[in-house]
Amino acid sequence: MITVSNLCVQFGKRILFQDVNLKFTPGNCYGIIGANGAGKSTFLKTLYGGIDATRGTVTIGPHERLSVLKQNHFEFDDCTVLNTVLMGYAELWRVMNEKDALYAKPDFSEEDGIKASELEEKFAEMDGWNAESDAATLLSGLGIKEDLHQKYMRELSGKEKVKVLLAQALFGKPDNLLLDEPTNDLDLDTVTWLEHYLSEFENTVLVVSHDRHFLDSICTHTVDIDFNRIQMFAGNYSFWYESSQLALRQQQMQNKKAEEKKKELEEFIRRFSANVAKSKQTTSRKKMLEKLNIEEIKPSNRKYPGIIFTPARECGDRILEVKDLSKTVDGVKLFSNLNFTVNKDDKIVFLSRNTRAMTILFEILKDHIAPDTGSYTWGQTITKAYLPLDNEKFFKDDITLMDWLAQFSEDTSDLYLRGYLGKMLFSGDEVNKKANVLSGGERVRCMIARMMIRNANVLILDTPTNHLDLESIQAFNNTLVKFKGNVLMSSHDHEFIQTVSNRIIEIGPNGMIDKLMEYDDYISDDHIAELRERLYQ
């Protein structure tokens, strides 16, 4: 259990949040949400002591253990994978090492024997005899194969390290578990495993995530950081979102009515204040006006970008035909014998256990890379807009955002360019920001503005939700659902896939699976599960 009392975090004159009084109890999972910069990660850091609060206290239950998902991927490079996980339970790791050091002494004394006996008792109480098998089970569940367990962390890829550090945080079933963006760099199957694990977790969990399906699957409560305060609501993210939108609409209507009433009273006073016959009535209305309290909606930290894709022309009957496409990169066969036709109104999500396969496929379809075998043909009516996974090469120049966007636009007038940048939340002087200093999320929003200007009827999106906050993801999602054209995309966002796509193509070294069905049905179908295994054998 974690108790927060009168917590305030302030940097200079800027107050992130204040007067926070919350209690996080066992058996519940709390999803922490808020706009970028609202203080989600900072709040987690105050809970585990990563930073000091300006004032207030954080209290952990007596004799309880708190575990945090580590963000430094190089901290354990000189440790084996299995030992890195075991270190997640610091007291158990200490006892293990102290016990082993005693037994290794050449002059093992009677006193050492007594000490060793005490350590053995502690070791057993902490279920130490099952520690290595429990750690191995976690690693396997997260997709780290057994032949990697004794390797050093420095030998692993970045994505494999993320999984090991997640296993470290989960190890030993801590009383309090704090996870900051745990699904980053995880494939969809691993995210599903983590959802099931946390759904059955009996202790206290606090999680920051931009994955709506993940939050909906595991959270019993939503903790919203906004208006410089932190509020807790029962229910998952979707329940909070729909409730908050309804409350905002109701408050706006109430404010509008109050404003209309105020104007009516002011007009009455102005017209009749000099009229003696009505002076009593005027005085009465003056008192009403003084009592009328119009509660303005406080300016939220949340901003929803205006993402709108408007095709300049409708797609014809021929969209895209792919025949016998294959590609091997660095000796790894990514896909082979791809054959499919894209039909009108298809919104296709491409899946693969090797995420590089989708990126290479999209690069081929954009004529950036040649396939090893096969061909592809786009229809004559097709115009394409592409959101690549790696956008770094687009932002190397020391130019303003206005000049950056002008490179991709026939209309280079200030008004036109400001309009598109404004839709992507760059307003006022922000349009003069330099392109080479943008954050990951800002870059993606610029790339979306570039796409919107093209007025394309086919959108190619490689992991489009990367670096975006929940508000941008929601806006992007809603737009793609309504888009009157074709979508070819990859994604690790379950909700994005489920709500946007109407067709699934999974590609692998042994061919492909092509199904007209929803994603939830696809991943729960036993027959398809067998086909998916054969795809990678």
Language-model regions: role of each:
Residues 136-142, 267-271, 287-292:
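Short amphipathic coiled-coil heptad-repeat segments
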Residues 1-255, 312-537:
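ABC ATP-binding cassette signature C-motif
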Residues 113-116, 186, 283-294:
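Extended non-transmembrane interhelical loops and adjacent amphipathic helices
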Residues 277-281, 291-301, 377:
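Proline-centered turn/helix-capping motifs that create local helix->coil transitions or kinks
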Residues 251-271, 278-287, 303, 526-537:
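ABC ATPase nucleotide-binding domains
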Residues 103, 241, 270-273, 277, ...:
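A structural signal for long alpha-helical coiled-coils and helix-turn connectors
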Residues 297-321:
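Amphipathic heptad-repeat alpha-helical coiled-coil/stalk segments that mediate oligomerization
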